[in-house]
Amino acid sequence: MNFIDERFERLKKEGKKAFIGYVTFGYPTFEETLWFIKLVYSYVDILEIGFPFSDPIADGEIIQKASIKALSEGVKLSHLFESIEKFKKDKPVVLMLYANTVYKRGIDRFFESCKACGVDGVIIPDVSFEESFEFKEVAEKFGIVYIDLVSISSLERAKMIGRQSRGFLYCVSRKGVTGFKGQIDDRIFTFLKELKTVTSTPLAVGFGIKSKEDVQKFKDLADGIVIGSAIITKIDEGKDKLEDFLKEISESLKDK
């Protein structure tokens, strides 16, 4: 059993759903990023760290701006690995980054570095399920969980992926990019119910979840909630606003 599996098992026993919080590495500045990462890590159950990329196709305006700012700070993948070594303790860390970054470092070298610094899982959003096996094979060799994404646009495809998934299955709550300000697509609720019938892998819902009210909508169906853009926004508002938000979301995920 990997560390991500262990975390979900523990949370299930505690009657709690996983709070998966996302931060962009290098944001708001290179000097401040580790401080904010540590703060978010102290409240979440699983930390997702995004490594900035110049063309982040899955990300909305908020995370795109954060990525551009982080890139202007001159962050490197080696900086990320060094930072993870400094704060990683008793909760899983997942990286989200684009395929070009992995290819640039070399697939074997990338996953070897992940293992060395304590990364538990990796999400590569611009790689399709069919193209993911070259990454999965190497990830497994180094004990890293490769996490699949599924979309409401194709339930049967999602079921196929779900049957083979590990760690948790990242369920995209609607079409589009992260941080979208529109309504959550109601089809996601039936989608989650159907997925539960074919996979025992925990289901984590993300994209556009920004409040405790949004969390409540998914609490009975999902095993975890992914929040990213809303956390970036709270970072912009300062430490106190961020910490209040993290506390509120964490409390809302407890079984009451």
Swiss-Prot record:
Enzyme class: lyase
EC numbers, comma separated: 4.2.1.20
Annotated keywords: Amino-acid biosynthesis, Aromatic amino acid biosynthesis, Lyase, Tryptophan biosynthesis
UniProt-recorded Gene Ontology molecular function terms: tryptophan synthase activity
Pathway: Amino-acid biosynthesis; L-tryptophan biosynthesis; L-tryptophan from chorismate: step 5/5
Active-site residues per Swiss-Prot or TrEMBL entry: 48 (proton acceptor), 59 (proton acceptor)
HAMAP family, alphabetized: Trp_synth_alpha (MF_00131)
NCBIfam families: trpA
Its job: The alpha subunit is responsible for the aldol cleavage of indoleglycerol phosphate to indole and glyceraldehyde 3-phosphate.
Protein name, per record: Tryptophan synthase alpha chain
Organism (species): Caldicellulosiruptor bescii (strain ATCC BAA-1888 / DSM 6725 / KCTC 15123 / Z-1320)
Designated gene of the protein: trpA
